[in-house]
């Protein structure tokens, strides 16, 4: 959430920066709400001043033994007006809050201008895509002999799900363990196990609500045995997490952290659940875009002056997984028009997918600035001992399913077997090759 003082101070400058990312700020709507708020506050202050003045008169009249009933009646009337004014102010403040919650973050000045992913800027590329001397198979065909089953998953749950058994399930598990071990043992993250179901306050804190509710899986929780209709206001909405970023970042919601406790660095392996509401017809084959997928998430909670240094470090941490797996990748900085809602700057890491003959996103690393912290009221005590908003960062380290796809396709052999990357062999009992079932 943006600082409302930024809008009050120079809304045109904020609107111009937001326009760079394709968002049109409702300047007139904000101005109208601000004018209404000011009018109500002015009227409230006038009523309070009048009530205070009359209260003094009552004291003086009573001190003289004179009748104060008329003045007391006027004070009572003012009290009713103040209650009505407070209610009006609550409504306007609520509308202002709703507007603020719907506004995306302002891009950092270092972010390149652009309208779509076509204008993202490559910052580095590592590894050379392998030249195959046999017809390349995609991960769906390769995985069929290794225990990857989309048909039975469709029977169980519908489209965009997968069942993994045998060798491919072991490889999937090995990848997640390898990622966690690398981040905790080499990159300084603390491993965390977090809930996969969170409340609405947590989703608001990291920015999924209210704007992106259609992308989430909602889990209503009823009070007692009543139906949802009978329960009415007693139904509390919970949500399956779309990423472990949500519970990890919310660890500091409504907290004031000691300055010397920063930075905080967490890593968690979790399933992620997304409805993919806006992705109809995209990546319908295979594991690239699923309703349920595993991911190792990195979150850093830092002091403001260190957040961009932390972003660079986090991006290198994600890249390091691909380096160790010896997978070709490239890193791009997202342009203003391709950035996520809460980000002030984002790097995407894309891995080479041979069957598609292109690079596909496998990680996004973002600096959210104080955008999430303001929503969560997450603060730290600065050197002067005063509470100050934290900066939060998050990044995929990595998406396990997409990494599995990349390993299967880049390490495939002509006979349909898959060579296990050297970095993963300790997690598979030294096994060097995954062979398809006869």
Swiss-Prot record:
ATP binds at residues 274-276, 361-364. CDD domains: SerRS_core. InterPro entries: aa-tRNA-synt_IIb (IPR002314), aa-tRNA-synth_II (IPR006195), aa-tRNA-synth_II/BPL/LPL (IPR045864), Ser-tRNA-ligase_type_1 (IPR002317), Ser-tRNA-synth_1_N (IPR015866), SerRS_1_N_sf (IPR042103), SerRS_core (IPR033729), tRNA-bd_arm (IPR010978). GO terms for biological process: selenocysteine biosynthetic process; seryl-tRNA aminoacylation. Catalyzes the attachment of serine to tRNA(Ser). Is also able to aminoacylate tRNA(Sec) with serine, to form the misacylated tRNA L-seryl-tRNA(Sec), which will be further converted into selenocysteinyl-tRNA(Sec). It is found in: Cytoplasm. Belongs to the class-II aminoacyl-tRNA synthetase family. Type-1 seryl-tRNA synthetase subfamily. Pathway: Aminoacyl-tRNA biosynthesis; selenocysteinyl-tRNA(Sec) biosynthesis; L-seryl-tRNA(Sec) from L-serine and tRNA(Sec): step 1/1. It comes from the Bacteria. The keyword Heme does not apply. Its EC number is 6.1.1.11. Consists of two distinct domains, a catalytic core and a N-terminal extension that is involved in tRNA binding. One of its GO terms (molecular function) is serine-tRNA ligase activity. This is Serine--tRNA ligase. Homodimer. The tRNA molecule binds across the dimer. GO terms for cellular component: cytoplasm. It catalyses: tRNA(Ser) + L-serine + ATP = L-seryl-tRNA(Ser) + AMP + diphosphate + H(+); tRNA(Sec) + L-serine + ATP = L-seryl-tRNA(Sec) + AMP + diphosphate + H(+). Keywords: Aminoacyl-tRNA synthetase, ATP-binding, Cytoplasm, Ligase, Nucleotide-binding, Protein biosynthesis. Pfam families: Seryl_tRNA_N (PF02403), tRNA-synt_2b (PF00587). SUPFAM superfamilies: Class II aaRS and biotin synthetases, tRNA-binding arm. The keyword ATP-binding applies. Its main location: cytoplasm. It comes from Ralstonia nicotianae (strain ATCC BAA-1114 / GMI1000). L-serine binds at residues 243-245, 297, 396.
């Amino acid at each position: 959430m943006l600082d409302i003082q930024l809008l009050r101070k120079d809304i045109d400058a904020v609107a111009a920066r937001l326009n760079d990312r394709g968002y049109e700020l409702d300047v007139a709507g904000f101005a109208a709400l601000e004018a209404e708020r000011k009018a109500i506050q002015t009227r409230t202050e006038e009523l309070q001043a009048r009530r205070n003045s009359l209260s003094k008169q009552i004291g003086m009249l009573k001190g003289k033994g004179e009748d104060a009933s008329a003045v007391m009646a006027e004070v009572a009337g003012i009290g009713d007006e103040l209650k009505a004014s407070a209610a009006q102010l609550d409504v306007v403040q609520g509308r202002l809050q709703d507007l603020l919650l719907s506004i995306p973050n302002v891009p950092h000045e270092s972010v390149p201008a652009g309208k779509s992913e076509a204008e993202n800027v490559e910052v580095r590329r590592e590894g050379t895509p392998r030249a195959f001397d046999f017809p390349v198979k995609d991960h769906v065909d390769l995985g069929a002999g290794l225990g990857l089953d989309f048909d039975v998953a469709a029977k169980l749950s519908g489209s965009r799900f997968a069942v993994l058994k045998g060798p491919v399930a072991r490889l999937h598990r090995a990848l997640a363990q390898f990622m966690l071990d690398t981040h905790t043992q080499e990159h300084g993250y603390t491993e965390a196990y977090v809930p996969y179901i969170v409340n609405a306050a947590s989703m608001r804190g990291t920015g999924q609500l209210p704007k992106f509710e259609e992308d989430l899986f909602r889990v209503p929780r009823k009070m007692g045995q009543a139906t949802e209709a009978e329960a009415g206001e007693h139904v509390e909405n919970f949500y399956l997490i779309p990423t472990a970023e949500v519970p990890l970042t919310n660890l500091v919601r409504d907290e004031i952290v000691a300055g010397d406790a920063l930075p905080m660095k967490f890593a968690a392996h979790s399933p992620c659940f997304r409805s993919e509401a806006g992705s109809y017809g995209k990546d319908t084959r295979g594991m690239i875009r699923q309703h349920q997928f595993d991911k190792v998430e990195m979150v850093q909670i830092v002091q403001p002056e260190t957040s961009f240094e932390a972003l660079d470090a986090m991006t290198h941490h994600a890249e390091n997984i691909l380096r160790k797996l010896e997978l070709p990748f490239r890193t791009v900085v997202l342009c203003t028009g391709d950035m996520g809602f809460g980000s002030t700057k984002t790097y995407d890491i894309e891995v080479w997918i041979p069957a598609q003959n292109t690079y596909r996103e496998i990680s996004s690393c973002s600096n959210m600035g104080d955008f999430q912290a303001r929503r969560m009221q997450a603060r730290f005590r600065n050197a002067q001992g005063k509470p100050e908003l934290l900066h939060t960062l998050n990044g995929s380290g990595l998406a396990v399913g997409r990494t599995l796809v990349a390993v299967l396709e880049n390490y495939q052999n002509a006979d349909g077997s898959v060579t296990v990357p050297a970095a993963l062999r300790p997690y598979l009992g030294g096994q060097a090759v995954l062979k398809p079932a006869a």
